[in-house]
Amino acid sequence: VAAAPADQSATMSTVTIKGEVFALNLESYGEFGEEMGLWNNKISGIDLSKTTILNNLNLYMNPIRTLDVSGQPFLLELDASYCELKEIDVTHNPELRSFSCYGNSLTSVDLSKNPELLVCNVKVNQLEAIDLSNNPKLEEVNVANNYLTAIDLSMLPALGKATLMNNELTTVDLSHNPELIDVSVGGNLLTSLDLTVNKKVQMLSFNDNAIRSLDLSANTDLYKIDCGGNGMTACELNDFFYTLPQRAQVVEEQPSANLTLL
């Protein structure tokens, strides 16, 4: 693939990849990126049929609209975010570790053939459901800004970061995710949340739900909480405050010792 001209833009229609290419970065940052000296590609298509050994493919913010990675059995990382995609097939990529496909128009995604997946970011799509039962190694899941009414995380024991905000979830079961550190469930329809098993949680956001009480006394690693927009009365907020893990001593040199309540 030829290098972009000095203005950091590469305007073309379809790119054909040939030969022994292990990693390919064609990420773009649009007009704003161009102003900052970053890439502004305008690739509308990519042909990968003449190479089969890709490990890493980054097509971020190129208007390709369709993408065929079925001939890439060794693909480890794929970023097809903001590519105007309505569908994508990754069932032929069994080694996939990182899958980023956010900011598209996906209504479904099949991850049943990706058992090695560690990171899944499909935020800002049109998903109404997602099945993660065949991805037991997942450490990070981001499904924010979709239309999910339910999500099953029970088969993800290694999950450390769950970003589920701005969906239509009425319940979230985190009792099988003891490694969670970062939990974001704001902007849903939750009335309760149980984090008694999640003793490693450090950051918690459950704003804009209908949660009127929550006992976090066992979550002693917490240092940041966003609980706004739940309709708590002054008394309920006061009761909630006194369930928070208290710091016996705050050391100025360690700001993380402070508990921030938003």
Predicted features, each with a name:
Residues 1-52, 56, 71-73, 94, ...:
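N-terminal capping/linker segments that flank leucine-rich repeat
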Residues 24, 36, 55-59, 76-80, ...:
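Conserved hydrophobic beta-strand positions in leucine-rich repeat
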Residues 46, 67, 88, 109-111, ...:
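Canonical leucine-rich repeat
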Residues 177, 182-191, 195-212, 216-219:
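Eukaryotic tandem repeat interaction scaffolds
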